[in-house]
Design a protein with these regions (language model features):
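Outer membrane beta-barrel strand-and-loop segments of large Gram-negative receptors
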Residues: 273, 391, 400-404, 438, ...
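N-terminal periplasmic accessory domains that precede
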Residues: 79-80, 123-124, 165-168, 182, ...
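Face-selective signature of the C-terminal outer-membrane beta-barrel domain
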Residues: 284-308, 332-482, 486, 520, ...
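Transmembrane beta-barrel wall of Gram-negative outer-membrane proteins
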Residues: 219, 223-254, 266-314, 341-345, ...
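Surface-exposed extracellular loop regions of Gram-negative outer-membrane beta-barrel proteins
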Residues: 370, 427, 474, 481-494, ...
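Short acidic/polar hinge/loop motifs at secondary-structure boundaries
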Residues: 123, 129, 156-184
Length: 804
């Protein structure tokens, strides 16, 4: 019953958890009178967990169901009073035997748990299962169609995700991931990077009592192999954890690209057929620990080391039909060796001051990443004569220092402040050897930030949170090369032109405000409005004036060191409704972005009587976009769950000077998952995601989708499990694009219409078997430090405590 009104609570959840194995055994929902009768319970020792949305959880234990002793074989829980939670809700948790999906006021949390289709996979497989999140065939992560996403690991940037600000998740094993947090509109407390949102991947640190571990192995088609192991030891004062992983396998893909150039008096064409085999070998090791000087404080350290070796072999076949017949039936091949490693150090401290009112967090992290890429390429004409052979060797490094301190103080039940400061120092560099000549590209970015956020609950149902963040950014880029600029081809000409303009400096400061309003409609329905200012800073690829590829002269692309950051004003309205059986979340957002960074600045460069098309990043004038998204999770019975999500967007970009930038894009995305758990028999999971037909500024992208199937059988009291799965059942995970646009050659002033059709597939349908074995006590502590202050997140799991 309600502790205040004494009225019965309908649909309250009552779960019986086996204390010995810490497993959900049975449960149910109360009727309209608040009554529930559970029968057929196996004998044993249990804890009863009583929950309802908007109320504080209550546990009753121990319940000893043994004949002749303990509580007997019948047990009456009696009258249970639940207290209403405050307006600042912690989380709404959808509990079950399968992976747990948690919807809080400001973010979505996906606990990887026993997710089947991502078992033995990577971070990309995990993210594809999260509502409104997509990972395309190139590894680009987007939220509701927006690819300006910041990827974090344990709340910080990591070498595991690569040197780019957006990051890559393919190198993170799914077995190392505990949960994923998706934050679409965070407050001024957090970095403003990521107009589309923030994805925080939280790695496992060990939450089970005593000595525990896990070993898993995967074998699949195309020589796919995966071996992972995690071990942790936890006591009242200490938590030690370590993990290692190895992953390899061939990724076979192909593609076609067709161009037509329609002039007023003729039509030229170019056809390209591509085949590619990529074989990555990834090895990783992670070790760390948490020391608890008191019940309120934690001191932690983590060391993360990983290395990769990757071989990529590509073959391109060109057939050209042009006016001068300069290029006819050419075969082009490349071989790329990519060897790299990274090392991350993170030292963290947290103190809750023996209260629920104060919290101090601080951390220092250092990340070092190196990447050595050796590329060899050549081409042959239709007469099998060697037309061009060259080699490129690039050594890249990326160093990141991050220092942060955050303090929270809740002066009263309805008033709190958050204040903090953060320094981020980044140093990127590339040493490039091309045709025996040495070139250098160094880029430094230092960010100094401070913030203040205030939360005020006006009533039990209405609250607000306002904040401001100040940033000072210092950037500097410098290029170097041969003292004599003696260009030998179009590539060296682009190099020399960029070096002549070096160095490039762009210091700037900015204020980032945020404001959030929360209204609690009912005990299980909430309405929230949020506003924040975001930034998408140019990354290394969009800044570097050196060509991204020195092999394929038909697709020249380079960055622009004069790029300005793009700024967005983001407004979002969210409605959420949560009950034991049904959870609904709907949101709509509006973004107004200035100085949009795009890859559509088309220029023409002439060298040795040949004109080349060069695609460069540039700032468009303005972009306005609207977005709507929603997800539903329905549990018709305790052993089954259905999750469905969808999103759509519409964006319009304009620029007064560059017609290449003008245009409209829109599209929709969708996904879902069905989970069936038949006790003592098996678990079945069917999942899928995709996109509808997209319109972009220059054409269309046809619809595509992926469907995955997984079946798992457990043995030895759930310690051993065998999972069989098929990824992309219909082999439909392809990328197709069809474009047309009007082009004017700035050198010859000749106009034509360019038509392009392209189709690519990076990974074919594949099947695999995964073995997983858990050892040790496999039981959570009865008392958990993460619940000490009643706050969510914290350092224990690398989560981001977002409040609203």
């Amino acid at each position: 019953i309600d502790s205040t009104t004494t009225k019965p609570i309908e649909y309250a959840s009552v779960s019986l958890v086996d204390l010995e194995h810490n497993e959900l055994v049975t449960g149910g929902l109360t009727d309209k009178n608040g009554i529930l009768n559970i029968t057929g319970i196996p004998l044993g020792k249990y804890v009863a967990v009583i929950e309802f949305i908007g109320y504080k959880k209550k546990e009753i234990s121990p319940i000893n169901l043994f004949p002749g002793e303990g509580s007997g074989i019948r047990y009456d829980l009696g009258q249970i009073k639940l207290s209403i939670s405050a307006v600042n809700m912690e989380a709404v948790e959808v509990v079950g035997d399968e992976s747990v999906f948690i919807q809080t006021i400001d973010k979505k949390i996906f606990n990887v748990g026993r997710d089947l289709s991502s078992s033995g996979g990577s971070g990309s497989d995990v993210l594809r299962k999260i509502p409104s999140v997509d990972v395309d065939i190139d590894g680009v992560v987007s939220i509701a169609g927006d690819a300006n996403v910041t990827i974090l690991v344990d709340g910080k940037r990591s070498g595991r995700t690569g040197s780019g600000r957006r990051g890559e998740v393919e190198n993170i094993p799914a077995s190392m991931i505990e949960k994923v947090e998706v934050i679409t509109n965070p407050s001024a407390k957090y970095d403003p990077d990521g107009v589309g949102g923030i994805i925080n991947i939280v790695l496992k640190r060990g939450v089970l009592d005593g000595f525990n571990g896990n070993i898993s192995a995967m074998q699949g088609q195309y020589n796919q192999k995966n071996l992972n192991g995690n071990v942790n030891y936890r006591t009242d004062k200490l938590n030690l954890f370590t993990g290692a992983n190895f992953r390899t396998g061939d990724r076979i893909g192909d593609g076609v690209r067709q161009f037509q150039y329609a002039y007023s008096n003729r039509t030229d064409s170019l056809f390209q057929n591509t085949s590619r085999t990529r074989t990555p070998d990834n090895l990783g090791f992670r070790i760390g620990g948490d020391y608890y000087p008191t019940k309120a404080s934690t001191l932690g350290y983590t060391l993360d080391i990983a290395e990769h070796k990757e071989l990529t072999e590509e073959e391109f076949y060109y057939t050209a039909n042009t006016q001068d017949r300069a290029l006819v039936d050419t075969e082009f091949h490349t071989t790329e060796h990519d060897d790299g490693q990274h090392i991350d150090h993170a030292l963290t401290y947290e103190n809750k001051f023996d209260s629920q009112e104060q919290l101090l967090k601080a951390y220092v992290s250092f990340s070092h990443e190196i990447d050595d890429v050796h590329e060899h390429g050549g081409s042959e004409t239709e007469h099998h004569s060697v037309d061009r052979e060259n080699e490129t060797n690039a050594m890249e490094h990326n160093d990141n220092w991050t220092l942060s301190i955050d303090y929270e103080d809740e002066f009263r039940d309805n008033l709190a402040i958050e204040v903090g400061a953060k320094t981020t120092l980044r140093d990127f560099g590339t040493d490039l050897n091309y045709l025996g000549q040495e070139y250098e590209n160094d880029y430094n970015e230092d960010i100094y930030a401070a913030y203040l956020v205030t939360r005020y609950d006006i009533t039990d149902r209405f609250g607000l949170k306002v904040g401001v963040r100040l940033e000072q950014v210092e950037t500097k880029a410098a290029l170097g090369g041969p003292t004599e600029h003696d260009s030998t081809n179009i590539i060296t000409k682009i190099f020399d032109d960029a070096i002549e303009q070096s160095p490039f400096d762009n210091p700037y400061s900015k204020v980032y405000p945020s404001a959030f309003l929360l209204y609690k409609l009912t005990e299980n329905q909430n309405l929230q409005f949020g506003y924040s200012k975001k930034v998408n800073r140019p990354n290394r690829r969009t800044l570097s004036p050196f060509p991204r590829s020195t092999q394929d002269l038909t697709r020249l692309r380079n960055g622009n060191p004069y790029l300005r950051p793009e700024y967005s004003d983001v407004m979002e309205l969210t409605f959420s409704s949560n009950s034991r059986k049904l959870n609904l979340n709907l949101s709509t957002s509006y973004k107004n972005t200035s100085d949009v960074i795009m890859w559509w600045d088309r220029d023409y460069v002439t060298f040795d009587s040949t004109t080349y098309e060069l695609l460069t990043a540039g700032n468009a004038e303005n972009s306005k976009s609207t977005n709507i998204s929603g997800n539903i999770m329905y549990r018709p019975m305790p052993l089954a769950s259905i999750m469905i999500w969808g999103y759509g967007w519409n964006s319009e970009t304009s620029d007064k000077g560059e017609s290449d930038f003008n245009g409209n894009s829109r599209g929709v995305g969708f996904g879902g998952r069905l989970t069936l758990n038949i006790p003592t028999v098996a678990r079945l999971e069917l999942s899928g995601n995709g996109r509808g037909k997209m319109k972009i500024t220059t054409g269309t992208i046809p619809a595509n989708f992926r469907v995955n199937l997984a079946l798992q059988k457990s043995f030895l009291q759930n310690r051993l499990s065998v999972t069989a799965k098929i990824n992309d059942i219909f082999d439909s995970g392809k990328f197709i694009i069809d474009t047309s646009n009007e082009v004017t050659n700035s050198i010859t002033q000749e106009s034509y219409t360019q038509y392009m059709y392209a189709e690519r597939q990076r990974q074919k349908r594949n099947a695999s078997i995964v073995l997983n074995y858990n050892f040790g006590k496999q039981q959570k502590r009865k008392w958990d430090r993460s619940n000490f202050s009643g706050r969510s997140g914290g350092m224990g799991g690398g989560g981001m405590d977002m409040d609203y």
